């Protein structure tokens, strides 16, 4: 259970990571994006967009109850379309190293297309990132969302970092 009174230094590395995804459709792009955040469970948080590094030894957990309005470090991808009938997708992957002293990699990807294509691509991006570093992968975890546009649609996927 996260305590609302817990205060963390902005320089303290988070020690948990949660993968979430959602979709939304609305009358304008911002509300479609907001609906996708709400459906992913992080719509009432202040997301601070980060680059794609998972702190060493961070645990991957289901999304905890985070106090509304909290500043949450988040890596995310999203795709918005205004073309009715078009399919959009967004995915996120986390590659965990065999050497637990090393950081992990978070990769995000979005596309006009389906969930499988998106998730396959984002997993391959994580593999390539590890190859570039010369590191061995222990595990890759991923999630993706897909949405067929009715009005203005958004697919969203994120890795939200937080504290135990």
UniProtKB/Swiss-Prot annotation:
> What stretch or stretches form a coiled coil here?
none
Cofactor dependence is on: pyruvate
Which EC class, in a word?
A: lyase
Stated EC number for the protein is 4.1.1.19
Q: Which Pfam families match?
A: PvlArgDC
The record's section on PANTHER family has: PYRUVOYL-DEPENDENT ARGININE DECARBOXYLASE
Name of the featured protein = Pyruvoyl-dependent arginine decarboxylase
Which organism does this sequence originate in?
Methanococcus maripaludis (strain DSM 14266 / JCM 13030 / NBRC 101832 / S2 / LL)
Q: Which gene is annotated as encoding this protein in its UniProt record?
A: pdaD
């Amino acid at each position: 259970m996260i305590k609302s009174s817990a205060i963390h230094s902005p320089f303290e590395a988070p020690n948990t990571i949660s993968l979430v995804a959602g979709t939304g459709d609305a009358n304008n792009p911002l509300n479609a994006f907001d609906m996708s955040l709400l459906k992913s469970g992080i719509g009432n948080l202040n997301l601070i967009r980060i680059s794609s590094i998972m702190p060493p030894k961070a645990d991957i957990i289901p999304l905890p109850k985070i106090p509304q309005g909290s500043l949450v470090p988040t890596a995310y991808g999203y795709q918005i379309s205004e073309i009715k009938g078009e399919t959009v997708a967004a995915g996120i992957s986390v590659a965990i190293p065999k050497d637990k002293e090393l950081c992990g990699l978070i990769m995000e990807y979005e596309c006009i297309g389906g969930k499988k294509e998106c998730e396959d691509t984002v997993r391959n991006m994580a593999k390539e990132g590890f190859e570039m570093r010369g590191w061995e992968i222990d595990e890759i975890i991923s999630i993706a969302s897909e949405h067929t546009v009715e009005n203005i649609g958004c697919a969203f996927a994120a890795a939200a970092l937080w504290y135990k």
